[in-house]
Regions:
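Accessory C-terminal segments flanking Radical SAM cores
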Residues: 1-87
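N-terminal pre-triad scaffold of radical SAM enzymes
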Residues: 6-23, 100-129, 190-193
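Membrane-proximal envelope and lipid/glycan-remodeling enzymes
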Residues: 29, 33-57, 80-83, 93-100, ...
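Recognition helices and adjacent regulatory flanks at domain boundaries
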Residues: 76-109, 119-121, 142
Protein backbone atom coordinates (compact mmCIF):
# COMPACT_ATOMS: atom_id res chain seq x y z
CA UNK A 1 0.00 0.00 0.00
CA UNK A 2 1.16 3.54 -0.73
CA UNK A 3 -0.23 4.83 2.57
CA UNK A 4 0.30 1.94 5.00
CA UNK A 5 2.96 2.20 7.72
CA UNK A 6 3.40 -0.68 10.16
CA UNK A 7 5.03 1.64 12.71
CA UNK A 8 1.62 3.08 13.54
CA UNK A 9 0.76 -0.32 15.01
CA UNK A 10 4.06 -1.91 16.01
CA UNK A 11 6.25 0.95 17.30
CA UNK A 12 5.83 3.43 20.15
CA UNK A 13 7.77 6.07 22.04
CA UNK A 14 6.13 6.83 25.39
CA UNK A 15 7.07 9.98 27.29
CA UNK A 16 5.73 9.13 30.73
CA UNK A 17 7.06 12.36 32.25
CA UNK A 18 4.49 14.48 30.41
CA UNK A 19 1.97 11.95 29.09
CA UNK A 20 2.76 12.09 25.39
CA UNK A 21 3.20 9.41 22.75
CA UNK A 22 3.93 8.84 19.08
CA UNK A 23 4.73 5.82 16.91
CA UNK A 24 7.67 7.28 15.01
CA UNK A 25 10.12 10.12 15.55
CA UNK A 26 8.76 12.14 12.60
CA UNK A 27 5.12 12.82 13.62
CA UNK A 28 4.61 15.21 16.56
CA UNK A 29 3.78 13.70 19.92
CA UNK A 30 0.21 13.90 21.17
CA UNK A 31 -1.48 13.62 24.55
CA UNK A 32 -2.42 10.33 26.18
CA UNK A 33 -6.01 10.37 27.48
CA UNK A 34 -5.91 9.92 31.27
CA UNK A 35 -9.56 8.87 31.46
CA UNK A 36 -8.99 6.15 28.88
CA UNK A 37 -5.89 4.97 30.76
CA UNK A 38 -7.94 4.20 33.86
CA UNK A 39 -9.60 1.25 32.13
CA UNK A 40 -7.16 0.56 29.29
CA UNK A 41 -3.41 0.87 29.96
CA UNK A 42 -2.66 0.06 26.30
CA UNK A 43 -3.94 3.59 25.58
CA UNK A 44 -0.34 4.61 26.21
CA UNK A 45 0.02 3.43 22.61
CA UNK A 46 -3.46 2.75 21.23
CA UNK A 47 -4.76 6.31 21.45
CA UNK A 48 -7.84 7.62 19.67
CA UNK A 49 -5.62 9.80 17.49
CA UNK A 50 -3.50 6.85 16.35
CA UNK A 51 -6.59 4.77 15.63
CA UNK A 52 -7.95 7.57 13.45
CA UNK A 53 -4.64 7.68 11.59
CA UNK A 54 -4.64 3.89 11.20
CA UNK A 55 -8.11 4.12 9.66
CA UNK A 56 -6.85 6.75 7.22
CA UNK A 57 -3.94 4.56 6.17
CA UNK A 58 -6.18 1.54 5.65
CA UNK A 59 -8.50 3.70 3.53
CA UNK A 60 -5.63 4.79 1.29
CA UNK A 61 -5.39 8.26 2.84
CA UNK A 62 -2.34 10.10 4.13
CA UNK A 63 -2.36 11.21 7.80
CA UNK A 64 -1.14 14.80 8.06
CA UNK A 65 1.26 13.96 10.90
CA UNK A 66 3.26 11.71 8.56
CA UNK A 67 4.02 14.52 6.10
CA UNK A 68 7.78 13.99 6.45
CA UNK A 69 7.50 10.68 4.61
CA UNK A 70 4.93 11.89 2.09
CA UNK A 71 7.23 14.72 0.99
CA UNK A 72 10.10 12.30 0.40
CA UNK A 73 7.92 9.88 -1.56
CA UNK A 74 6.41 12.66 -3.66
CA UNK A 75 9.84 13.42 -5.11
CA UNK A 76 10.60 9.77 -5.80
CA UNK A 77 12.52 8.98 -2.61
CA UNK A 78 12.26 6.00 -0.27
CA UNK A 79 10.93 7.21 3.07
CA UNK A 80 11.21 5.83 6.58
CA UNK A 81 7.64 4.55 6.19
CA UNK A 82 9.04 1.86 3.90
CA UNK A 83 12.02 1.09 6.11
CA UNK A 84 9.99 0.93 9.35
CA UNK A 85 7.41 -1.34 7.73
CA UNK A 86 10.20 -3.64 6.58
CA UNK A 87 11.79 -4.06 10.01
CA UNK A 88 11.83 -7.66 11.25
CA UNK A 89 9.83 -6.75 14.35
CA UNK A 90 7.16 -5.09 12.19
CA UNK A 91 6.98 -7.98 9.72
CA UNK A 92 6.59 -10.42 12.62
CA UNK A 93 3.36 -8.65 13.61
CA UNK A 94 1.58 -8.70 10.24
CA UNK A 95 -1.16 -11.07 11.38
CA UNK A 96 -1.74 -9.04 14.56
CA UNK A 97 -2.02 -5.83 12.52
CA UNK A 98 -4.58 -7.43 10.21
CA UNK A 99 -6.57 -8.68 13.19
CA UNK A 100 -6.48 -5.34 15.04
CA UNK A 101 -7.45 -3.25 12.03
CA UNK A 102 -7.98 0.42 12.78
CA UNK A 103 -9.95 0.19 16.02
CA UNK A 104 -8.40 -2.76 17.84
CA UNK A 105 -5.72 -2.54 20.50
CA UNK A 106 -2.34 -4.04 19.68
CA UNK A 107 0.86 -4.59 21.64
CA UNK A 108 3.81 -2.97 19.85
CA UNK A 109 6.98 -4.96 19.15
CA UNK A 110 9.29 -1.91 19.39
CA UNK A 111 8.97 0.18 22.57
CA UNK A 112 10.91 3.22 23.72
CA UNK A 113 10.09 4.68 27.12
CA UNK A 114 11.14 7.75 29.08
CA UNK A 115 10.33 7.20 32.75
CA UNK A 116 11.99 10.21 34.32
CA UNK A 117 13.47 13.64 33.61
CA UNK A 118 16.18 13.28 36.29
CA UNK A 119 19.70 13.79 34.91
CA UNK A 120 22.98 14.97 36.41
CA UNK A 121 24.30 16.48 33.14
CA UNK A 122 23.26 19.42 30.95
CA UNK A 123 24.50 18.51 27.47
CA UNK A 124 24.33 21.40 24.99
CA UNK A 125 22.05 19.49 22.60
CA UNK A 126 19.59 18.58 25.37
CA UNK A 127 16.75 20.50 27.02
CA UNK A 128 15.21 21.28 30.44
CA UNK A 129 12.29 18.93 29.78
CA UNK A 130 14.78 16.04 29.53
CA UNK A 131 17.23 17.06 32.26
CA UNK A 132 16.61 18.33 35.79
CA UNK A 133 20.10 19.87 35.79
CA UNK A 134 19.26 21.85 32.65
CA UNK A 135 15.97 22.96 34.19
CA UNK A 136 17.74 24.11 37.37
CA UNK A 137 20.22 26.21 35.37
CA UNK A 138 17.53 27.91 33.29
CA UNK A 139 15.52 28.70 36.43
CA UNK A 140 18.62 30.30 37.96
CA UNK A 141 20.09 32.15 34.97
CA UNK A 142 17.27 32.33 32.43
CA UNK A 143 17.08 31.18 28.81
CA UNK A 144 19.93 31.66 26.33
CA UNK A 145 19.57 34.60 23.95
CA UNK A 146 20.19 33.50 20.37
CA UNK A 147 19.72 35.17 16.98
CA UNK A 148 16.07 34.21 16.47
CA UNK A 149 14.82 34.07 20.06
CA UNK A 150 15.58 32.31 23.34
CA UNK A 151 16.99 28.81 23.69
CA UNK A 152 15.45 26.54 26.34
CA UNK A 153 12.84 29.06 27.47
CA UNK A 154 10.80 27.36 30.20
CA UNK A 155 7.60 29.29 29.43
CA UNK A 156 7.78 28.15 25.81
CA UNK A 157 8.39 24.53 26.83
CA UNK A 158 5.50 24.74 29.29
CA UNK A 159 3.09 26.05 26.63
CA UNK A 160 4.09 23.10 24.43
CA UNK A 161 3.36 20.78 27.38
CA UNK A 162 6.87 19.36 27.16
CA UNK A 163 7.85 19.94 30.78
CA UNK A 164 7.14 16.99 33.08
CA UNK A 165 3.96 16.93 35.12
CA UNK A 166 4.61 18.02 38.70
CA UNK A 167 3.80 14.71 40.33
CA UNK A 168 5.81 12.41 42.54
CA UNK A 169 7.06 9.37 40.62
CA UNK A 170 4.82 7.02 42.61
CA UNK A 171 1.81 9.20 41.72
CA UNK A 172 2.46 9.42 37.99
CA UNK A 173 -0.60 7.85 36.30
CA UNK A 174 1.34 7.17 33.10
CA UNK A 175 3.99 5.16 34.94
CA UNK A 176 1.26 3.32 36.86
CA UNK A 177 -0.46 2.40 33.58
CA UNK A 178 2.84 1.24 32.10
CA UNK A 179 3.40 -1.28 34.89
CA UNK A 180 -0.18 -2.55 34.59
CA UNK A 181 0.42 -3.16 30.90
CA UNK A 182 4.01 -4.39 31.15
CA UNK A 183 3.47 -8.16 31.78
CA UNK A 184 1.24 -8.42 28.70
CA UNK A 185 3.35 -6.01 26.62
CA UNK A 186 6.52 -7.95 27.41
CA UNK A 187 5.30 -11.26 25.96
CA UNK A 188 5.93 -10.37 22.29
CA UNK A 189 8.36 -7.49 22.81
CA UNK A 190 11.36 -7.57 20.45
CA UNK A 191 13.05 -4.17 20.95
CA UNK A 192 12.96 -2.21 24.21
CA UNK A 193 14.79 1.06 24.80
CA UNK A 194 15.00 3.12 27.98
CA UNK A 195 15.82 6.81 27.57
CA UNK A 196 15.64 9.78 29.88
CA UNK A 197 16.72 11.82 31.64
CA UNK A 198 19.41 9.50 32.86
CA UNK A 199 18.02 5.94 33.16
CA UNK A 200 20.53 4.99 35.88
CA UNK A 201 18.97 7.61 38.15
CA UNK A 202 15.53 6.03 37.92
CA UNK A 203 14.32 3.01 39.90
CA UNK A 204 12.13 1.83 37.01
CA UNK A 205 15.27 0.97 35.02
CA UNK A 206 16.42 -1.50 37.65
CA UNK A 207 12.90 -2.84 38.04
CA UNK A 208 12.89 -3.59 34.29
CA UNK A 209 16.27 -5.34 34.48
CA UNK A 210 15.08 -7.51 37.36
CA UNK A 211 11.90 -8.43 35.48
CA UNK A 212 13.81 -9.39 32.33
CA UNK A 213 16.19 -11.54 34.37
CA UNK A 214 13.30 -13.39 36.03
CA UNK A 215 11.34 -13.67 32.76
CA UNK A 216 13.86 -14.46 29.97
CA UNK A 217 12.90 -13.42 26.45
CA UNK A 218 15.27 -14.87 23.86
CA UNK A 219 13.95 -12.51 21.15
CA UNK A 220 14.38 -9.30 23.10
CA UNK A 221 16.92 -6.63 22.12
CA UNK A 222 17.28 -4.21 25.00
CA UNK A 223 19.15 -0.92 25.27
CA UNK A 224 19.55 2.14 27.47
CA UNK A 225 20.55 5.68 26.53
CA UNK A 226 22.93 6.56 29.35
CA UNK A 227 25.71 9.05 30.07
CA UNK A 228 27.42 6.22 31.99
CA UNK A 229 28.38 8.49 34.87
CA UNK A 230 25.52 8.66 37.39
CA UNK A 231 26.05 10.93 40.41
CA UNK A 232 26.40 8.03 42.85
CA UNK A 233 28.92 5.22 42.16
CA UNK A 234 26.54 2.73 43.76
CA UNK A 235 24.13 3.23 40.84
CA UNK A 236 26.77 2.31 38.28
CA UNK A 237 27.87 -0.68 40.34
CA UNK A 238 24.29 -1.88 40.63
CA UNK A 239 23.79 -1.43 36.88
CA UNK A 240 26.91 -3.45 36.04
CA UNK A 241 25.90 -6.18 38.46
CA UNK A 242 22.48 -6.52 36.84
CA UNK A 243 23.92 -6.39 33.33
CA UNK A 244 26.24 -9.26 34.07
CA UNK A 245 23.21 -11.42 34.73
CA UNK A 246 21.71 -10.69 31.33
CA UNK A 247 22.80 -12.31 28.09
CA UNK A 248 23.03 -9.21 25.90
CA UNK A 249 22.30 -5.51 26.29
CA UNK A 250 23.25 -2.41 24.31
CA UNK A 251 24.35 0.87 25.86
CA UNK A 252 23.83 3.91 23.63
CA UNK A 253 26.46 6.47 24.56
CA UNK A 254 27.49 9.75 22.98
CA UNK A 255 30.57 8.72 20.92
CA UNK A 256 32.18 12.11 21.51
CA UNK A 257 32.27 11.37 25.23
CA UNK A 258 33.63 7.85 24.86
CA UNK A 259 37.01 7.43 26.50
CA UNK A 260 38.85 4.37 25.11
CA UNK A 261 41.15 4.48 28.12
CA UNK A 262 38.35 4.43 30.67
CA UNK A 263 38.42 0.67 31.07
CA UNK A 264 34.71 0.48 30.31
CA UNK A 265 35.24 -1.85 27.35
CA UNK A 266 32.60 -4.28 28.56
CA UNK A 267 29.81 -2.33 26.88
CA UNK A 268 28.88 -1.71 23.26
Amino acid sequence: SETMCYAKWTQVSMHLTNGKTHSCYHPPTHDIDLEELKTNPTALHNTKEKKEQRAQMLAGERPEGCSYCWRIEDVGGRSDRVYRSGEYWAQNAREEIAEAGADGDINPRYVEVNFNQACNLKCSYCSPHLSTTWEKEIKEFGAYDIVDGEHNNLDSLSKQRLLPTKLAQNENPYVTAFWKWWPELYKNLEVFRMTGGEPLMDSNTFKILDYVYKNPNAWLEMSATSNMCPPKPVLMNMFIEKLQRLEEIQIWEDPEKFNPNSGNNWYV
